[in-house]
Design a protein with these regions (language model features):
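C-terminal regulatory
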Residues: 20, 24-100, 105-130, 149, ...
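Short phosphate-engaging motifs
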Residues: 1, 91, 143-144
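Short, charged low-complexity intrinsically disordered segments located at boundaries
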Residues: 9-11, 67, 126, 141-146
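Generic signature of intrinsically disordered, low-complexity, basic-rich segments
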Residues: 5-6, 87, 144
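A bilobed periplasmic-binding-protein/Venus flytrap-type ligand-binding module shared by bacterial periplasmic
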Residues: 38-44, 133-144
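Central regulatory/effector-binding core of bacterial HTH transcription factors
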Residues: 1-22
């Protein structure tokens, strides 16, 4: 999304923290979401009562790929030495439910799966509580108009009310 905003293809976007501090880009905090490590209950990491440090490295970690050239060669939240990179969060979710690998997911997206037993929250010593911050972004030289400014403000207020 950041690349689309910087190139002028999009005037406003919602992005994560990966591009914090880029020249020519303004950012307004509009929320965050907790990322938690999960796997299907049949996965070895889910079956273990207590995973030892480093246990997750031995299993395929499903990661969301960032196709932007701005983050080329950078990894975020990678624990495993064996990973599959996916372009879509929905595909990652489907593979996790199917028992293929483990990975960090937005807690609201997997809440029903955790409650129903389709996924299990993993206890991993190397995983620290992760909140993924989200910002509305726009080019410094092209501030949002009234409608986009209202939308950004609305996102920010909604986030303050729910977090």
């Amino acid at each position: 999304m950041t690349q689309l905003v910087l190139s002028g293809v999009a005037s406003v976007g919602i992005s994560g923290p990966e591009h914090r501090g880029l020249a020519g880009l303004e950012q307004v905090r509009v929320g965050s979401v907790e990322l938690i490590p999960v796997a299907a209950p049949t996965h070895p990491l889910a079956k273990s009562v207590s995973n030892s440090p480093g246990a997750a490295r031995d299993h395929i970690q499903l990661l969301l790929a960032d196709r932007s050239t701005l983050t080329e060669g950078k990894d975020f939240g990678v624990v495993g030495v064996r990973s599959w990179r996916l372009a879509d969060l929905g595909a990652k979710h489907a593979l996790l439910v199917a028992g293929i690998g483990w990975g960090g997911m937005p807690e609201p997206m997997v809440r029903a799966d955790l409650e129903s037993g389709r996924l299990k929250h993993l206890e991993l010593p190397e995983w620290s509580c992760a909140f993924y911050a989200m910002q509305a972004i726009y080019r410094t030289e092209a501030p949002p108009g009234p409608a986009a400014a209202w939308l950004i403000e609305r996102f920010a207020k909604q986030s303050d009310a729910t977090w």
